[in-house]
Amino acid sequence: MRLEQLQAALRVAETGSFQEAAQKVGCNQSTISRQVKGLEDELGIALFRRQGRMKLTAAGERLLPRLRRICQEWQTACTEIEELLTGRQTELCMAIADSIGGCYLPAVLNRFQQQWPSIHLRVSTLGSDRALKVLRDGLIDLAIVMDSPTLTTSAGLVVDLLLEEEVQVLLSVDHPLADQKAIAWEQLSHVPQVVFKDGYGMQRLVEQRFRELGLELNSCLELNSLDSFRGVVREGYWLALLPQAALVDARHDPRLVIRPTAEPRLTRRIKLVIPEEQLSLPPVRHFRQLCREAMTAELCDFKTLSQLF
């Protein structure tokens, strides 16, 4: 049973004539007749009385309401898909890491909204692991996350490197290490640290660096809010290793200081992840282009970014 057969039967029922039905859909009469006959053969019963004007049989009368619903649903589906393909979707959903959303993304969102004012933006702040899961589940259109080993093995995903930024040390002005110009990893291993919760890319990145250096990470507290990080570090007991984007507000806090680590320096890579099929949608393609323009080599200098955002 094919959609064309159902549409042909509906047109004949509406017009009462093979000829008029053919004119309505723009094909010849024999095509309509063949499609209706094929449907009747498949159902095993006649749908029309073929004497004079075509009239529905009892079976045809029962089928007619369903024919209308099926054909209407198909037309609605075609219209909605056309709207997507021509950029007339109503919303764009994305998930981002907390530190990215507050620093790098506002200008991109602003430019996108100015150019696509009819699209409602939905931005969720999630850890990288969770963001990738909801992306794969089809609940969002795109994600901006930290680099992950799983990204290199993810079929069907288009992955763009947006930027690479340094991870630095956030301390209280009263912390014993605050006077140092750069803090050695050996020293960091002996002081209590605040880290991101499990499932956040930053936690894995920091843990991996300590393992590579043969050191132990002294993590004493897990958080997932940048405000909470700043609050507990102000108390002077803990310190935190955070990416530059997460340190924008801390730079203006007189009770906090930021120091680089000694060599080897640690960086994190931020990537835009989009399912391949989503790139057929104009708003998604345009958002991708805006992200790539915003994260050019000139804008990836942190001092420039901190002034812009």
UniProtKB/Swiss-Prot annotation:
The record's section on PROSITE patterns has: HTH_LYSR (PS50931)
Q: Which residues bind DNA?
A: 18-37
Q: Which GO terms describe its cellular component?
A: cytosol
Give GO terms: molecular function aspect only: DNA binding; DNA-binding transcription factor activity
Q: Where is the HTH lysR-type domain?
A: 1-57
| Alphabetically ordered keywords of this record | Activator, DNA-binding, Transcription, Transcription regulation
SUPFAM superfamilies xrefs: Periplasmic binding protein-like II, Winged helix' DNA-binding domain
InterPro entries xref list: HTH-type_LysR_regulators, LysR_subst-bd, Tscrpt_reg_HTH_LysR, WH-like_DNA-bd_sf, WH_DNA-bd_sf
What role does this protein play? Seems to regulate utilization of fixed nitrogen by controlling the expression of a certain gene(s) involved in nitrogen metabolism.
Record-stated family? Belongs to the LysR transcriptional regulatory family.
- What's the protein name? Probable nitrogen assimilation transcriptional activator
Q: What is the lineage of its organism?
A: Bacteria, Bacillati, Cyanobacteriota, Cyanophyceae, Synechococcales
